[in-house]
Amino acid sequence: TIVVEAPVVKSSVSFLDANTNPVTLEELTTQCVVPTWANQELTIAHQDFISCVHDAASSFYAGETVNAPDIRCSHIVRGRTPQSLGKKASELLECEKTQFYQRLAFAFTIPTIYETVNGQKLELCVGGVRNYSDLNLYRSTKGLEKFSVFIGWRVRICSNQVLTGEAVSYTHLR
């Protein structure tokens, strides 16, 4: 039997499944508002953060397959348009409702960049985390915006046991 290993075109990045909702970039763009500081200056939108990291990885790893990001969000904040401030929540029309997610995590793989260690395939994985509550949006002026970005190797395992192992360190990328 000949086994030919081919890169997986779309490998999902399962992470943070508990207490989060899967969303798409399109949903973030069309269904969520961008929060503002107290002086009404916009923050950087979650979808802009994701697109920036994805575009940077695509540019840096030009010629490689860069999968679409898997996005998880939590802590939805619901609001309303200024025109509907006097209405009860039950009387709001859909066009008068607003929402955004306070917390965001995303990750995507680059399956054409991989290493094999002890028979396990490790794919390169890039992602980020953001939390609007770290920003203190009630400040009177715009403050620093915080973002967390990570890059590392992802290994797929299937086990129903507690796992331990030795760390692997590489000083070069393929």
Annotate each predicted stretch with a short phrase:
Residues S58-Y114:
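Ser/Thr-rich, low-complexity intrinsically disordered terminal regions
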Residues F106, T116-L144:
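Broad, structure-driven detector of short, well-ordered beta-strand segments within folded domains
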Residues V168:
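TRNA-recognition modules of translation machinery and tRNA-sensing kinases, especially anticodon-binding
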Residues H46, I50, Q99-R103, L144-F150:
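A general secondary-structure signal for short beta-strands and their flanking turns/coil
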Residues T1-H54, S58-T65, P69-V77:
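Feature for intrinsically disordered/low-complexity regulatory segments and propeptides
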Residues K142-N160:
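Short, hydrophobic/proline-enriched secondary-structure or compact coil segments at domain edges
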Residues T171-H172:
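Conserved small/polar residues in nucleotide/adenosyl-binding loops
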